[in-house]
From Swiss-Prot:
Keywords attached to this entry: ATP-binding, Glycerol metabolism, Kinase, Nucleotide-binding, Transferase
Keyword DNA damage (UniProt): no
Any single Pfam family the record assigns to this protein: FGGY_C
Residues annotated for ADP binding in this entry: 13, 17, 266, 309, 410, 414
Protein's organism: Shewanella sediminis (strain HAW-EB3)
GO biological process entries: glycerol catabolic process; glycerol metabolic process; glycerol-3-phosphate metabolic process
Pathway the protein contributes to: Polyol metabolism; glycerol degradation via glycerol kinase pathway; sn-glycerol 3-phosphate from glycerol: step 1/1
Highest taxon above the source species: Bacteria
Protein name: Glycerol kinase
Amino acid sequence: MAKKYVVALDQGTTSSRAIIFDHDANIVSVSQREFPQIYPQAGWVEHDPMEIWASQSSTLIELLARSGIHGSEVAAIGITNQRETTVIWDKLTGKPVYNAIVWQCRRSSHICDELKAQGLEDYVRETTGLLLDPYFSGTKIKWILDNVAGVRERAEKGELLFGTIDTWLVWKLTEGKVHVTDPTNASRTLLFNIHTQQWDSKLLEALNIPESLLPEVKPSCAVYGKTRIAGEGGEISIAGIAGDQQSALFGQLCIDEGMAKNTYGTGCFLLMNTGKQAVKSTHGLLTTVAIGADCEVNYALEGAVFMGGATIQWLRDELGLIRDAQDTEYFASKVEDTNGVYLVPAFVGLGAPYWDPNARGALVGLTRGSNRNHIIRAALEAIAYQSRDLLDAMAKDSGVMLKQLKVDGGAVSNDFLMQFQADITNVEVQRPAITETTAMGAAFLAGLAVGFWSSTSELKHKADIERTFIPSISAEKCDELYCGWNRAVTQTIKS
């Protein structure tokens, strides 16, 4: 049967999804399942790895059944995933030794402090491009080894395997035959030298992590193994892997130096491709791995905002100001401005460029005249302000002043937010016709690996822009608003 489709598995923080793309990069069908979040104590976030696998595998089976597409028509499966989230399992039984520790989890802060005390901060920065922060996988691995009974001994005997979620899914899909990751995911572990593209022995020693735990690192665009849907039928190639943000960067075809995208999800993640040069940030950004025009390793600057769409969830779930996230555009548009109100959503600290884990959220500028509409508008504007923080830092680090910003993620359907983003950055904001760019990136990688598409040049004709938002306020007004935001952030950090 002719190979007509590519499937992307998009394993996220709150749900697992499977999406079928045809040769024109149109979405044919989507399947999605949510899974529970586990919060054992304040600042701790976990997932059950078996629930991740169950949700992801069931979406794949359901996707093909619902669409009527036979597995033999699928050219390849690509995988994109929440990054940094850490799983350790028994390599014989496949049973996890502990729940997956999620990227948001802060439990390993003390390990980061210990590494700083050992004088490793600069070495980590130079080698991995990252900061010493519990966000990344390395300290999560060490926490499991040190705190779960018997795990360190088993790891040192070579009985256990570590993986980020991509590695876990490939291992399960191949029935334990393949233990692999790609450079984009490896670069988020705190253990990977982004210059040599190798695991770093000094960092492994510092964290006391056996190298036998670690997966083999293969290119993002490659055939890793084969899988059978529900263990039946012919085999399908697993042929592309990228961490979610690098996958979105590739899906937006930001494959040349100076191109950037911002993903509006639970958090916001802004990445700029810096080509063959690993730019060292002096403004609070991360240096990470990206994917180039020929699927080769490129580098990128990355800024992460912890509270993007999660801020809107807070308005809905904790304050009860809205019933649905889509309501925010209506309420925000009912007022001309926020009447001086700023919301700094530092509920779990502040990410780039501040990196202050002790900052806490604040609602600044409230008066007797402040109402629900002002607060809702301030919440949306906060997402755009934080993205402006990242863009300014990138301009200082790279010397590149962006003229266009590509956007994706759930919140880009909010026209108010997109227009305000253009206004506050003085940059054109381009919204794609297909906003599933994270999944599209994985599909592109898989399709290129097996020859379903010939090159990224062919793909450029498949990424249409649905709307461009043009800056519409004066430079003076923009500066006035942004100065107010900076004052609010300063108060938050001081408090």
